[in-house]
């Protein structure tokens, strides 16, 4: 059975690839992303050496989503009222949460903002899912486990 799937923070590397795959499998896919955390506008010139290349990659990503009929609404998922209205409008069967600060240097510079963008968005998503009895899939990274003693990390590696 095909599903209505909402990706929160879905314009990143993982999110846009996941959206394309889910759409190819026949699902109805919708993305919401603030486009303000990990995109080109959130970096200073000194943060990125190949700014034009990076901008091109992001623009190509957005064009690819559009070309494949994947709708994007620019919305900050920290805004509970606005994001709840959006969730109600799309009425997803499944919500996949990808919103986060994905760059370690940005996370370390501003842990408060990292918490706000990573967990306030998750809190709002979980609250909606609880009220509407929707499934949530939470994707994260190894950064949530802290620093590791070795360069290689496996499922058996002890967390810091």
Spell out what each predicted region is.
Residues 1-160:
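N-terminal Rossmann-like NAD(P)+-binding domain of SDR-like oxidoreductases, especially those catalyzing
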């Amino acid at each position: 059975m095909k599903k209505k799937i909402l990706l929160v923070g879905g314009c990143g590397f993982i999110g846009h690839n996941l959206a394309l795959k889910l759409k190819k499998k026949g699902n109805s896919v919708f993305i919401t992303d603030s486009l303000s955390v990990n995109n080109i506008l959130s970096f200073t010139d000194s943060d990125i050496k190949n700014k034009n290349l990076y901008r091109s990659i992001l623009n190509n990503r957005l064009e690819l989503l559009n070309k494949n009929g994947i709708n994007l609404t620019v919305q900050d998922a920290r805004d509970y009222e606005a994001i709840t209205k959006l969730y109600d409008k799309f009425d997803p069967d499944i919500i996949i949460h990808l919103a986060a600060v994905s760059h370690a240097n940005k996370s370390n510079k501003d842990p408060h903002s990292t918490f706000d963008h990573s967990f306030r968005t998750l809190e709002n998503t979980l609250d909606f899912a609880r009220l509407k009895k929707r499934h949530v899939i939470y994707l994260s990274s190894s950064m949530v486990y802290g620093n590791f003693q070795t360069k290689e990390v496996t499922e058996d590696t002890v967390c810091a």
